[in-house]
Swiss-Prot record:
The gene is wuho. One of its GO terms (cellular component) is nucleus. It comes from Drosophila pseudoobscura pseudoobscura (Fruit fly). WD repeats lie at residues 75-115, 162-201, 205-243, 302-342. The keyword Repeat applies. The keyword GTP-binding does not apply. PROSITE patterns: WD_REPEATS_2, WD_REPEATS_REGION. Wuho means 'no progeny' in Chinese. The lineage of its organism: Eukaryota, Metazoa, Ecdysozoa, Arthropoda, Hexapoda. Forms a heterodimer with the catalytic subunit Mettl1. Interacts with mei-P26 and weakly interacts with bgcn; required for the function or formation of the mei-P26-bgcn-bam-sxl complex. Interacts with nanos; may be involved in mei-P26-dependent derepression of the BMP signaling pathway. Interacts with Myc; the interaction may be mediated by mei-P26 and may be involved in the regulation of ribosome biogenesis. Keywords: Cytoplasm, Developmental protein, Differentiation, Nucleus, Oogenesis, Repeat, Spermatogenesis, tRNA processing, WD repeat. Pfam families: WD40. This is tRNA (guanine-N(7)-)-methyltransferase non-catalytic subunit wuho.
Length: 396
């Protein structure tokens, strides 16, 4: 998986065992984090499996694959899954696959300093710091959401809530009263915090997976979905305020606040469409009224390579994807959608050489869509044939 995002003034790219920090103007690397091949060498603690009561201790041959991975008897390749900054940019959290862990770094002033490394139960799907950076939320692919303390950095995680399907994004309100999650089963859930056993509200209306969430105001969020819609909600009461039709399913969403206040730029990565990215201008007209005032579609040479992620700045769109099963990056002008000019010669080779990229296959996003089975039509067809056969027998 390749992750990329822009956090003023840095462009951050994570892939394999490295995180690169670039100046978005000249694309020069000024800092990097490299993980070791074995995370136990930097402090990841393993847990020995506990045999069932009355059962003899299992041999290594009898241990399930997951337990072999935890005890280190099977070597797995470490790869970065998600990366995010705290709001004040003082902390950076990242999660890994292979040896599943969440790592917390002090990111300032110069070189990143590892503060803690704690095991994850399952592969992560999203990361989000709280507003004061005192803890970070990690959601996983089975629907659970854990809280990791960033003050007591060695504290065990706390399970806060769970969904019945994979959680694709998570938000934490500025006042830390609500945790907002979205999942593959088209639901947006608003959960009270710290009493996370109490669900405050739902934002219902999407017909497919909800791939992204973003906070707009203290009471409003925007969501993107595989049902080809953008929607704005008052999440405190679960009320839909805007539904905007998209030309294709949305699999990634980024939101930037513009001037004047309550004006936003919303960028959406489409699934399998002739134009790869849609850029929309969103404005709040009254307290409970929103509108899309402009639309720009960016082709980004869709169809010639497999696009998987992107980052947005004031004037550029940075896109990652696969070409001939190799990771690559392309930069486009956000004003006209054309390839960006004025980039330093050799920048792409420099970045890819630093990432030491091997074969790269983006995630198969087709599995995000629900599988629908129509047993009724088949039943009715069989019933129709049976009735016709019975009529023929009577006539014969």
């Amino acid at each position: 998986m390749a992750t990329i995002f822009f956090a003023e003034p840095e462009l951050v790219i994570g892939h394999g065992r490295k995180v690169l920090f670039l100046n978005p103007g000249d694309l020069q690397i000024f800092k990097e984090i490299e993980l070791p091949p074995d995370l136990t060498t930097c402090g990841l603690k393993t847990v020995e499996p506990v045999p069932a009561p009355g059962h003899p201790a299992s041999s290594s041959k009898q241990q399930p694959a997951a337990l072999k991975e935890a005890t280190g008897s099977v070597k797995v390749e470490v790869s970065i899954q998600n990366v995010t900054y705290s709001p004040d940019r003082q902390l950076l959290a990242l999660t890994t696959a292979g040896q599943k862990a969440v790592l917390l770094y002090k990111s300032r002033p110069e070189n990143a300093q590892l503060l803690s490394i704690r095991p994850l139960a399952r592969a992560s799907s999203a990361l989000r710091f709280c507003s004061d950076g005192s803890s970070v939320l990690v959601t996983d692919k089975t629907g659970d959401c854990y809280q990791y303390d960033c003050v007591e950095v060695d504290a065990s995680p706390r399970l806060l809530l769970g969904h019945l399907s994979i959680v694709y994004d998570v938000l934490w309100s500025e006042d830390q009263q609500y945790i907002i999650t979205c999942d593959r089963d088209d639901k947006i859930r608003v959960t009270n915090y710290p009493a996370t056993f109490d669900i405050h509200s739902y934002c219902l209306g999407h017909k497919e997976f909800v791939s992204g969430l973003a906070m707009l105001t203290e009471q409003h969020i925007i969501s993107a979905s595989g049902d080809k819609t953008l929607r704005v909600w008052n999440y405190t009461c679960g009320k839909e305020l805007l539904l905007h039709e998209l030309p294709a399913p949305a699999v990634r969403m980024l939101v930037r606040q513009l001037e004047p206040e309550k004006t936003y730029e919303v960028a959406v990565l489409f699934y399998d469409y002739v134009d790869a990215i849609g850029v929309y201008r969103l404005e709040q007209t009254t307290t409970e009224s929103w509108s899309i005032t402009s639309t720009q579609l960016v082709r980004a040479e869709a169809g010639t390579w497999n696009i998987c992620n992107f980052a947005l700045t004031d004037d550029r769109i940075y896109v990652t994807g696969a070409e001939n099963e190799r990771l690559t990056l392309r930069v486009y002008d956000s004003r006209n959608g054309e390839r960006a000019s004025g980039l330093p010669e050799g920048w792409l080779k420099m970045v890819l050489d630093n990432l030491d990229v091997a074969a790269f296959m983006p995630e198969d996003l087709s599995v995000w869509f629900k599988k629908r089975f129509d047993n009724v039509s088949e039943y009715l067809e069989r019933k129709k044939r049976r009735i016709e056969e019975q009529k023929q027998q009577k006539c014969g």
